Structures are given as structure tokens and as C-alpha cells.
Amino acid sequence: LDLIGQASQILKLAGEIEGRGRNEDALAYFRDGVQFRNCLLVELPRGDFGDTMLRQFLFDAHSVLLWESLASCAHAVLSAIAAKALKEDKYHLRHSSEWVVRLGDGTD
């Protein structure tokens, strides 16, 4: 799952739990401005490649911890979504952490 796929599945589940007939699109797009939430970390200025990769690493590390926790929850559907997302996010964490180490080592 990419981030859009993860969000879509979580919002679909939220709509089912809510029980008011709203699908993922209704939950995602049809709300007041103050109801929108996001991770402020990803709003930081891009900066150079090192800044970008460190920010990506921090985001990936948080995502892995979140999905690990949700993968062991009692709600079967949420647990399944989290397990699938965790697999992909571990790949992203490995990729970004390799870049952080590479950039941290510098050049000779």
C-alpha cells in the first residue's frame, strides 16, 4: 500500500464503523477546513537532499511504530490493514535509513 492506499483503507473502515453511510471520499474531502489534520513534519521546507532524507527517515520510523502497534490490535480489519502497511513501510524505513547513514558518513 502506498500512503494513498493506506489512507483510503483506513477511511473506508472509519466510514463503516461510523455507520452513517459515508465512504472514504466523503470522509476525506467533504469536511470543514478545521477538520483537516496532517503531519507538520512533512510541511517543513525541502532544504537539501540530506534534510529531505532525514525528514523521510523520521516519518518512516514513526509510521513503522504506528503500524506495528495497530497490527496487534483486537480489531481484525484494522489489524490486517496495519499488517499490510507495515510490510511496505519497513521497506521505506530501510531505504531512508540507508540514505541517512550514507550521507552521515560523508566523503573522504
List where the protein language model places each region.
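Short secondary-structure boundary segments
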Residues: 37-39, 63-64, 68, 77-78, ...
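DHp/HisKA dimerization-phosphoacceptor four-helix bundle of two-component histidine kinases
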Residues: 2-5, 55, 84-91
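A contiguous pocket-lining binding segment that forms or flanks enzyme active sites
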Residues: 77-108
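Acidic/His metal-coordination segments adjacent to aromatic residues that form catalytic metal sites
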Residues: 30-56, 103-107
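Conserved alpha-helical segments that form or flank metal/cofactor-binding pockets of metalloenzymes
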Residues: 2-30, 96-101
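Amphipathic, well-ordered alpha-helical segments in soluble domains
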Residues: 6, 10, 59-66, 92-96
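Alpha-helical bundle segments that constitute or directly flank the non-heme di-iron/ferroxidase center
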Residues: 1, 45-73
